[in-house]
């Protein structure tokens, strides 16, 4: 009987041991490359409405900006082309049944097809893809999982996070910089090379975009992943592109560390004169730039502070690596 009690205690102690369920590598390939990014939505996004002959479509009270149209008369649609084809096939009916997704719940509505001259209109503004520029944060050389951006991709009209069906990262060439100033976030201006694809996107989250790097891995020195408690106030650097495809390292100063928030763990200010002269501070397109300290990769740039664009936020690299593995 005594032996059984001891065994029970031993089993309980085993269950209490912490288990690391994430399998990311301890050494990863740092990014810094500017990327072209294109994501396609799960369904067709409704982004707004317009009047036809002075009034809105009668289906509009049910349909909201930010909804995803997923079916027309039970036919699945994921692109504007598929949506148009499904509607055109039912023009003679004068209306269609629309299946919508909102907050992961399915809703239905009837949508009148209104004739205006020689064409039929729905009164809906829609889109199914978004393209932009961001920065690669890392590639895990063992799994080929990549992380980039450090924050979510949102649809600009609704400000909603895009529910991604699939997407791509591809070659991007910086042609100039629109400088930041107080009250205004500048941006990287870029040329897109859609035919030079680097990887496939399968996830869009509030801590970055993730997927599989399909191309040949960059020939770079792998950097050790820093634990959160290794990140210190003081000097660090970011890797990013300001011209063409040339990755350079620029000095920053980490001013505050917050371990208890998810997306703004690292507060920093730019101290590099060259970077400040060329950009005025943090600019759009810089999101995802890896942050390096003491030879280790510690995080990624995520946000600019508009009131003082020489300052910004970053998140811990471990947060991105864990999200990439989920």
Spans of model-derived segments:
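Sec-dependent N-terminal signal peptides of Gram-positive bacterial secreted proteins and lipoproteins
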Residues: 2-23
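PDZ/PDZ-like groove recognition
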Residues: 31-65, 267
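PDZ-domain C-terminal substructure recognizer with occasional recognition of PDZ-binding tails
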Residues: 35, 84-123
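Short, flexible surface segments
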Residues: 42, 65-66, 232, 287, ...
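A short glycine-leucine-enriched loop at secondary-structure breakpoints
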Residues: 56-68, 89-91, 281-285, 290
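Conserved PDZ fold ligand-binding element
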Residues: 60-81, 291-293, 298-299
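Serine endopeptidase catalytic core focused on the charge-relay Asp
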Residues: 115-280, 284, 293-294, 302, ...
């Amino acid at each position: 009987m005594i032996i059984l009690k001891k065994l029970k205690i031993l089993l309980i102690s085993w269950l209490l041991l912490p288990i690391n369920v994430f399998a990311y590598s301890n050494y990863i390939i740092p990014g810094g490359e500017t990327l072209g990014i294109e994501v396609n939505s799960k369904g067709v996004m409704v982004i707004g409405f317009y009047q036809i002959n002075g009034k809105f479509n009668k289906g509009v009270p049910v349909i909201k900006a930010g909804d995803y149209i997923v079916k027309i008369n039970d036919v699945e649609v994921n692109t504007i082309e598929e949506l148009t084809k499904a509607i055109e096939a039912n023009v003679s009916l004068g209306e269609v049944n629309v299946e919508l997704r909102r907050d992961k719940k399915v809703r239905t509505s009837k949508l009148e097809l209104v004739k205006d001259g020689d064409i039929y209109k729905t009164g809906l503004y829609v889109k199914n893809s978004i393209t932009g520029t961001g920065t690669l944060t890392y590639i895990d050389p063992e799994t080929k999982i990549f992380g980039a951006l450090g924050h979510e991709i949102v649809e600009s009209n609704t400000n909603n996070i895009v529910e991604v069906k699939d997407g791509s990262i591809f070659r991007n060439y910086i042609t100039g910089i629109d400088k930041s100033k107080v009250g205004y976030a500048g941006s990287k201006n870029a040329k897109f090379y859609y035919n030079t694809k680097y990887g496939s996107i399968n996830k869009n989250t509030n801590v970055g975009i993730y997927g599989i790097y399909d191309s040949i891995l960059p020939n770079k020195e792998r950097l050790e992943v820093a634990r959160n408690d290794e990140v210190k106030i003081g000097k660090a650097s970011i890797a990013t592109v300001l011209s063409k495809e040339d990755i350079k390292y620029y000095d920053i100063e980490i001013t505050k560390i917050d371990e208890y928030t998810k997306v703004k763990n690292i507060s920093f200010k730019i101290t590099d004169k060259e970077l400040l002269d060329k950009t005025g501070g943090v600019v759009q397109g810089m999101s995802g730039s890896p942050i390096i300290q003491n030879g280790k990769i510690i995080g990624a740039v995520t946000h600019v502070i508009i009131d003082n664009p020489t300052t910004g936020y970053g998140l811990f690299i471990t947060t991105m690596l864990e999200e990439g593995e989920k």
